[in-house]
UniProtKB/Swiss-Prot annotation:
The gene is PBF1. Pfam families: Proteasome. The 26S proteasome consists of a 20S proteasome core and two 19S regulatory subunits. The 20S proteasome core is composed of 28 subunits that are arranged in four stacked rings, resulting in a barrel-shaped structure. The two end rings are each formed by seven alpha subunits, and the two central rings are each formed by seven beta subunits. The catalytic chamber with the active sites is on the inside of the barrel. This is Proteasome subunit beta type-1. SUPFAM superfamilies: N-terminal nucleophile aminohydrolases (Ntn hydrolases) (SSF56235). Non-catalytic component of the proteasome, a multicatalytic proteinase complex which is characterized by its ability to cleave peptides with Arg, Phe, Tyr, Leu, and Glu adjacent to the leaving group at neutral or slightly basic pH. The proteasome has an ATP-dependent proteolytic activity. Keywords: Cytoplasm, Nucleus, Proteasome.
Length: 223
């Protein structure tokens, strides 16, 4: 007689993909709206993007219960900051806060993989990419989530500066115009949904520039 062993994990991976691209005066952040577990789609209309400040937006994939808890912590700490300083956090400051928050939980981490994007104090686009325990870097572009292994090689091919080095450093911003960056992001997701079953349904795109924040959407594969 075989003995069955109970197996329970505090984590799940709800899939999904996030992409961010920074330009000279803009930032584009995009994510699909599919949330799934295993081979089951839980919902086709779940936004992975949240506005943290007037010039700062975060997109997250991974375990969405942990993501929601992380979002609440960041929102409450940003509210305290506003009461103490009478102003909103800058995007680089929010980037440091997110790193500290993730690192604080490193022994039982938030199972979330985040990209933070927005405009810095000079009006330049900025993108910060993270691992699950708070290690982060400012880059010109990044992707997180189940489709990132498909999208990052494509972004490297299109955007990484030519260099004789094997792994050249990224520039802090990309040379693309805002319209070119949006088209590139749409192409990335259209390709990724062909190969990644955890990415699909609908693409949500958030564009930040000096005029403010606007949103665009695009339909993706639903199978």
């Amino acid at each position: 007689m075989t003995k069955q062993q109970a197996n329970w994990s505090p984590y799940d991976n709800n899939g999904g993909t996030c992409v961010a691209v920074a330009g000279a005066d803009y930032c584009v952040i995009a994510a699909d709206t599919r949330m799934s577990t295993g081979y089951n789609i839980l919902t086709r209309d779940y936004s992975k993007i949240i506005k943290l400040a007037d010039k700062c937006v975060m997109a997250s994939s991974g375990f969405q219960a942990d993501v929601r808890a992380l979002q609440k912590v960041l929102a409450s700490r940003h509210l305290i900051y506003q009461h103490q300083h009478n102003k909103q956090m800058s995007c680089p400051a929010m980037g440091q806060l997110l790193s500290n928050t993730l690192y604080y939980k490193r022994f039982f981490p938030y199972y979330s993989f985040n990209v933070l994007g927005g405009l810095d104090s000079e009006g330049k686009g900025c993108v910060f990419t993270y691992d699950a325990v708070g290690s982060y870097e400012r880059v010109g572009y990044s992707s997180q989530g189940s489709g990132s292994t498909l999208i990052m090689p494509f972004l490297d091919n299109q955007l990484k500066s030519p260099s004789p080095l094997l792994l050249p450093a990224q520039d802090a911003v990309t040379p693309l115009s805002e319209a070119e960056a949006i088209d590139l992001v749409k192409t990335c997701f259209a390709s990724a949904t062909e190969r990644d079953i955890y990415t699909g349904d609908r693409l949500e795109i958030v564009i930040l520039n000096a005029s403010g924040i606007r949103r665009e959407e695009m339909e993706l594969r639903k199978d």
